[in-house]
Amino acid sequence: MKGRLLDAVPLSSLTGVGAALSNKLAKINLHTVQDLLLHLPLRYEDRTHLYPIGELLPGVYATVEGEVLNCNISFGGRRMMTCQISDGSGILTMRFFNFSAAMKNSLATGRRGLAYGEAKRGKYGAEMIHPEYRVQGDLSTPELQETLTPVYPTTEGVKQATLRKLTDQALDLLDTCAIEELLPPELSQGMMTLPEALRTLHRPPPTLQLSDLESGQHPAQRRLILEELLAHNLSMLALRAGAQRFHAQPLSANDALKNKLLAALPFKPTGAQARVVAEIERDMALDVPMMRLVQGDVGSGKTLVAALAALRAIAHGKQVALMAPTELLAEQHANNFRNWFAPLGIEVGWLAGKQKGKARLSQQEAIASGQVQMIVGTHAIFQEQVQFNGLALVIIDEQHRFGVHQRLALWEKGQQQGFHPHQLIMTATPIPRTLAMTAYADLDTSVIDELPPGRTPVTTVAIPDTRRTDIIDRVRHACITEGRQAYWVCTLIEESELLEAQAAEATWEELKLALPELNVGLVHGRMKPAEKQAVMASFKQGELHLLVATTVIEVGVDVPNASLMIIENPERLGLAQLHQLRGRVGRGAVASHCVLLYKTPLSNTAQIRLQVLRDSNDGFVIAQKDLEIRGPGELLGTRQTGNAEFKVADLLRDQAMIPEVQRLARHIHERYPQQAKALIERWMPETERYSNA
């Protein structure tokens, strides 16, 4: 095996790795020895020195050594083995709920043992529940660990001990095999070598400060963080370079339709809308496909920006497709576009999963013939049987629901006669700048950072659930006395549509009883699309006073007369999602209110989060706070990019490095294309498929 590169050495060549273990390791993307070496510890335990039992404090993880005083099995409410050991400074009780006869026999009175675990304060002094322990024999010197003990991310059926043993073998192989140094010499100067960094992180010497590792500041970590962030940025540059190789139809200035629409509008676009439209039009005039992300806060007028971009393509006799994540939102877009485009003689088509038979067929024919110039729908518009006629622009609404993979698939679908469509992605979920720079480095970004005049900021209050009857009275007052409409949003922590629907139904029944004079509607994710549409339509037309809903109404529903929203259990949702929900009110000129109806007691984090919402109506401020409180993985969600999860890097902790990383990534991309490709393959093997799309 000498001299081989470790990315070519399969894990099956290690002692103890058979087919069953290979399959389990594959679940956490471990296939080669290099993969294993890059599978870094989540945290470390210090088992290198002994703690006197008498000095143990609750919450401290420690190794203790002592003589077994007694070991008993009790059969109270639950079968349990308790064992007491003493080191002269104090007595520790160890409790085990899963144990065997062999374990009990090994802990015979008079034996000496080592135990490692979290100290707790028990009825009779210090105790540990299910500590790891090892019997020492009678007089032997305790065998302590020589390095800090790593704790790895794992999967069902793969124990920490197994990963540690396999990693020991992998580290031994570093002496005979090579792991390729991929950083150019001018970057790696003065840094730890890769083998050095890996040895340090897998087996840190006891002299190393745990606090350095916990803060991510150790030179070994910085070496790998730099490499991982570079790989991430290089993958985005590769996607981008791939896009630049393609041709798009250049759509030069042709403003006749645009000017007609602007003249017919009862308002003037904001400065921010005009600026973003100009950025889009500049991109569309080029012969490479536009790839632009438009971020706009709730209610900032992204739909008008999309309409003006669409008119540029339609003026050239081309087609435009707009894809939204839900039928509800797609239908609303279709209605908006019809209102704007019908007077201009432009036909708007609509395609969704629920359309069947003749209706669907005739819509497909109208698209294929070019009779329909603007097509709005869900992902159904990109199914095989839909044929476009000169598709030049694809607009995707709500990027969070579509990953990078769908983004590329959709692009391929639109390719005709060697031309790729321009692509515009719109999101109402503001993304903090550092995250946007990393997760969307393959896109140009525009921000609509101004709300249209006449929008009233929503006043937000947090009220405990114990005052529920007061809130119900407030709903009655808003709907009857003030003639307004209200939302009551039910949330559940489980990602279960069924449980969420049941909770909403129970609340609906409760509110119908409490408010007999109101018409109360219900909408949730388990209802058929047609039922949902019917309820939403009657709410929009003012036939319902109060709408009980699950978080399905998070995006895009526009009812200007709704001025009050109650959100139950807001502590269960992220800030960005709460801000999205709150954006359903405050869409008219009247003062609007949002009540966060929380369950007591609230944790510290929940209190901080609800305070952020009370203090700010700015989606970008809220997104930055959400990032600080929850971290980047949750905010971006792997559902969305498939790559928010990093092995060593942490976008929040390492955000100061990102501008420099981007500069270095461009340098490697231009000067060292082979290393760039190898870095992407090392850290992001999944992405490599897409950068060749």
Feature locations, PLM:
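Upstream accessory/linker segments immediately N-terminal to the RecA-like ATPase cores of bacterial MutS
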Residues: 74-264, 638, 671
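Short boundary/loop segments of OB/S1/cold-shock single-stranded nucleic-acid-binding domains
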Residues: 42-62
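Inter-lobe coupling/hinge segments of SF2-like helicase ATPases
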Residues: 275-278, 288-611, 667, 671-675, ...
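N-terminal pre-Walker A segment at the start of P-loop NTPase domains
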Residues: 267-277
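Long, highly charged, low-complexity intrinsically disordered interaction regions
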Residues: 1-15, 23-26, 232, 242
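Structural detector for short beta-strands of small beta-barrel domains
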Residues: 58-79, 117
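C-terminal accessory region of SF2 helicases/translocases
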Residues: 601-693
